[in-house]
Amino acid sequence: MAKPTTVKIKLVSTADTGFFYVTKKNPRTMTEKMTVRKYDPRARKHVEFKEAKIK
């Protein structure tokens, strides 16, 4: 079985609520850290989410 091309990453909220999303990314095409503006239900607004490793 071949190694998967995508890796799972965790998108952690910068609002310090502890909320996170889990998503996939292709490390060959996206070499830099991912930052996305998404909705944080604990803060009840759209905030920036930054990439972190899944432990």
From Swiss-Prot:
GO BP, one annotated term: translation
Keyword Ribonucleoprotein: yes
Record-level GO cellular component terms: cytosolic large ribosomal subunit
Alphabetical list of InterPro entries matching this protein: Ribosomal_bL33, Ribosomal_bL33_CS, Ribosomal_bL33_sf, Ribosomal_zn-bd
Pfam family, one: Ribosomal_L33
Keywords per UniProt: Ribonucleoprotein, Ribosomal protein
Gene3D superfamilies: Ribosomal protein L33
Record-level Gene Ontology MF annotations: structural constituent of ribosome
Keyword field contains Membrane: no
NCBIfam families associated with the record: PRK00595.1, rpmG_bact
Stated family: Belongs to the bacterial ribosomal protein bL33 family.
The name this protein goes by in its record: Large ribosomal subunit protein bL33
Protein species of origin: Sphingopyxis alaskensis (strain DSM 13593 / LMG 18877 / RB2256) (Sphingomonas alaskensis)
Protein's gene: rpmG
